[in-house]
Amino acid sequence: EGNSSYFLLAVSDDSDPNGSWNKYRINVTSFDSNIDSPNLAVDDEVIYLAADFFSPDSYLVLCVDKSDALVGDSLEITQVSLSGSGNQSLGLPVTWDANSPQYLIQSSEGTGNGVNFNEIRLWSIENPLGTPSMVSHDLSVPTYAYPQHPAQQGTSVRPYLFEPRFWSCVQRGGSVWAVHHVNSSRARVRWYEIDMQGWPDSVSTPQLAQWGEIDAGSDVSTYFPSIAVDEDGNAAICFSRSSSSEYISMCEVRRQADDPSGEFQPMNFVRTSTSPATTGRWGDYSGAAASANNSG
């Protein structure tokens, strides 16, 4: 709004989304005036709100007392921030594990040609409702690069993919599952399961348990993914795909917890466009969620 920055937060007063909602407008202009890419996560006690600010890259995380928001009271909020130099967009995993730290995840950025990145950065928020602080760990991963903007049938306009930033991640069963799009020659969805090893409270550090890419074949790009994981460790990824001979489609893939490591099952088409998208924007708020009633 003009030169001001706000988070808009809405919380239902019970499990019925058709009922009443408690709505908040949180002014963060004092941090910076050009908020972008808001993200949200929750755990047992805290609602976490994160966003990018671009003068220069910097990141703000608000820690909101969940009990206030559930009953519509004035919010008790603490905050922590960090510089974005060399890293991009804080992914905030929804936290299903009780008594677990809140983690965040960032991809690399900043090289002149946007290629040959080989790590991602993990953060843990300590004491979120007191005096919050953050500790980090850099995890080595297979090399990745900025994604190529994908072709689509019927137009020269290509959806803008930004960077290999993390918009979607889940914390469940002691792991963080995260997805982004990578590859400077043909964009592909990449996914990771990161075993957090109880970090930072343990003497161990996070380990890459498994990873993979969703490759739909020659000339087909996959991009803007979102991921969901259920209580049994089954996972699903929703994403877009297109090529010079395909309109943009919405697709999904799934894996069972006992499937071979690093593999998802064949993709399914959910919906296919019947004409090209010409605005230049597509899918950056893709979302996926596990059913609350059925696992698997």
PLM segments and residue spans:
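C-terminal PAP-associated
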Residues: 1-296
